């Protein structure tokens, strides 16, 4: 997004290519006003985790609306994408599982994989041949395999061949986790992310 910079020696408009604020919503007047109005009603924080007493009607409302938008039975909000990734991997694996992950996955996915107790195997970035080689090797000895990828890799912008990866996972009877952090709301039909057309296979 564009933003103005001014000072003693500079007065110009720049384009931000280094942040995750793709649409400049952090400085959008309508968003700021809506946040202000909501703060007057909800306050500045819930006071505790949702597990204790921090679950507010606004959380439930957002989860319900996101679920309808994404055609999902339910959606669960987390304080951050980092925490969501760690929790998702730990929910889908255990010490007897094998995780086969792209070499360029985000650190949160890597931390989740390592703390899950599962065996972690890496495959070459977006390399279907290397992925299938590892799936063929490990699916013979383990029936609890989770493949971990990102739909779009934040560090260098490459897009995963999701359709082909879903077919490989189906062929080898494996689960697939797709991190949509940098695609949801931006890419795909109606901004629903790049994996949305293949949800029945994920």
Q: What does each model-identified segment do?
A:
Residues 1-44, 174:
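N-terminal "arm"/small-domain region of PLP-dependent enzymes with the aminotransferase-like
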Residues 33, 37-80:
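Conserved N-terminal alpha-helix of the aminotransferase class I/II PLP-enzyme fold
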Residues 80, 100-117:
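Substrate-binding/gating loop at the entrance of the active-site cleft, primarily
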Residues 88-107, 128:
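Conserved PLP-anchoring active-site segment centered on the Schiff-base-forming lysine
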Residues 95, 115-117, 172:
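Short, structured coil segments at secondary-structure junctions
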Residues 121, 125-178:
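Active-site phosphate-binding strand-loop segment of PLP-dependent enzymes
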Residues 172-173, 192-202:
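Conserved active-site segment immediately N-terminal to the catalytic lysine
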């Amino acid at each position: 997004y564009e933003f103005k910079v001014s000072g003693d020696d500079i007065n110009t408009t720049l384009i931000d290519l280094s942040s995750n604020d793709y649409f400049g919503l952090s400085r959008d007047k309508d968003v700021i006003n809506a946040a202000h109005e909501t703060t007057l009603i909800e306050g500045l924080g819930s006071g505790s985790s949702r597990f204790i007493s921090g679950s507010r009607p606004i959380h439930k409302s957002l989860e319900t609306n996101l679920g309808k938008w994404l055609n999902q039975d339910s959606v669960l909000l987390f304080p951050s994408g980092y925490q969501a990734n760690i929790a998702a991997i730990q929910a889908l694996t255990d010490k007897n599982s094998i995780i086969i992950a792209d070499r360029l996955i985000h650190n949160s996915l890597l931390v989740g994989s390592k703390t899950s107790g599962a065996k972690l195997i890496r495959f070459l970035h977006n390399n279907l041949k290397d992925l299938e080689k590892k799936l063929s090797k490990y699916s013979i000895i383990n029936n609890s395999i989770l493949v971990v990828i990102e739909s779009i890799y934040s560090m260098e912008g490459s897009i995963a061949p999701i359709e082909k990866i879903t077919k490989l996972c189906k062929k080898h009877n494996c689960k697939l986790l797709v991190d949509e952090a940098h695609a949801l709301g931006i890419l795909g039909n109606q901004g629903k992310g790049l994996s949305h057309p293949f949800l029945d296979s994920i």
